[in-house]
Amino acid sequence: MATTIDARALAAPLVEALLTTAAEQIRAAAPRIAGLSASEAAAVLPADLLPQVRNFLLTMAKEGLTGELNAVAAALPGYLETGSRAVDASVTSAIELSAEQKERITRELQQRYGDVHVTYHVDPTLIGGLIIRVGDQVLDNSLRARLSAIQRVLQAS
């Protein structure tokens, strides 16, 4: 009998614990580093901070944003509660896609990336094909991109 493990469900308690710990550490450090430069903040931060929290706090100090730390700490637990950990995806096509095509693309993106919010756009200059953006990844399978690639190869020869 095959079992399916829901990795996201298994990881949820870990993610919740990490976010809670990060929020607590940010809240505790906020008054200590308020108004300090990054080098001054580094000197007063506790050694037992999560490395990511330490780096985040130093970046906030460097950018002069320590006044926003309490708001950031308050927002962290909300990522789990509101489900806002979903990935945003954008699909651009040369023509309007049918409901069936959109459903298939959404399903495939969800299989690959988990919780995905997909928005669809039409850009006739693509000529054909799709451009799919998920987070910072871009898959440009448009006819416009293919023709541009052929043009670059021909110009290089």
UniProtKB/Swiss-Prot annotation:
Entry's Gene Ontology molecular function annotations: proton-transporting ATP synthase activity, rotational mechanism
Membrane association type: Peripheral membrane protein
One CC-aspect GO term: proton-transporting ATP synthase complex
Keyword Manganese: no
Subcellular location: Cell membrane
Cystines in this chain: none
InterPro entries: ATPase_OSCP/d_CS, ATPase_OSCP/dsu
Keywords: ATP synthesis, Cell membrane, CF(1), Hydrogen ion transport, Ion transport, Membrane, Transport
GO biological process: proton motive force-driven ATP synthesis
Family stated for the protein in its record: Belongs to the ATPase delta chain family.
SUBUNIT field: F-type ATPases have 2 components, F(1) - the catalytic core - and F(0) - the membrane proton channel. F(1) has five subunits: alpha(3), beta(3), gamma(1), delta(1), epsilon(1). F(0) has three main subunits: a(1), b(2) and c(10-14). The alpha and beta chains form an alternating ring which encloses part of the gamma chain. F(1) is attached to F(0) by a central stalk formed by the gamma and epsilon chains, while a peripheral stalk is formed by the delta and b chains.
PANTHER family for this protein: ATP SYNTHASE DELTA CHAIN
Protein name: ATP synthase subunit delta
